[in-house]
């Protein structure tokens, strides 16, 4: 699989599906998983719908750069990795789908690099802000 040097100390492993000329869709996995979370059939299906699909191992997962145990890194650093990957691929803007922690990174991308995002979709995620109120109980209640 190819790698992108997204910063002096971070190398990201990624995989592409589809045609380079199609709109780019970047898939961000959650904590404790890797690019394989996004199954190949799912990625090829999206590519068949007219997207260039990018799945990648975020820092400290899969084949990407590992950091010493206990090292801290931030959502802004992880967002910068995505921007570095887009730069490496020469992609001006992309549709971003983030799952769990990937959704938190996607939200940070939308805030800090909004012009690079065509759309942002967050799946099973939160903002990570502990100062926000809890979800409304009515919204969590079963319907029907």
Question: Which ranges hold each PLM region?
Answer:
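A structural alpha-helix within SAM-dependent methyltransferase catalytic domains
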Residues: 43, 83, 111-114
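Helical cap/lid subdomains and adjacent loops of hydrolase enzymes that gate the active-site channel
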Residues: 133-144
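Active-site loop/oxyanion-hole signature of alpha/beta-hydrolase fold enzymes
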Residues: 61-101
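Conserved HGGG/HGGXW glycine-rich cap/lid loop of the alpha/beta-hydrolase fold
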Residues: 6-68
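Conserved hydrolase catalytic core segment
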Residues: 92-135
């Amino acid at each position: 699989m190819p790698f992108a040097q997204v910063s002096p100390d971070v190398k990201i492993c990624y995989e592409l599906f589809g045609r380079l000329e199609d709109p780019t869709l970047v898939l961000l996995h959650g904590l404790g998983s890797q690019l394989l979370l996004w199954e190949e059939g799912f990625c090829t299906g999206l590519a068949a719908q007219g997207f260039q699909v990018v799945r990648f191992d975020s820092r400290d997962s899969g084949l990407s750069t590992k950091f010493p145990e206990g090292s801290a890194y931030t959502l802004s650093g992880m967002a910068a990795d995505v921007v570095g990957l887009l730069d490496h691929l020469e992609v001006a803007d992309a549709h971003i789908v983030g799952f769990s922690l990937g959704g938190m990174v996607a939200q940070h991308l939308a805030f800090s690099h909004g012009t690079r995002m065509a759309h942002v979709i967050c799946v099973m995620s939160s903002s990570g802000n502990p100062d926000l109120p809890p979800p409304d109980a009515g919204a969590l209640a079963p319907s029907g």
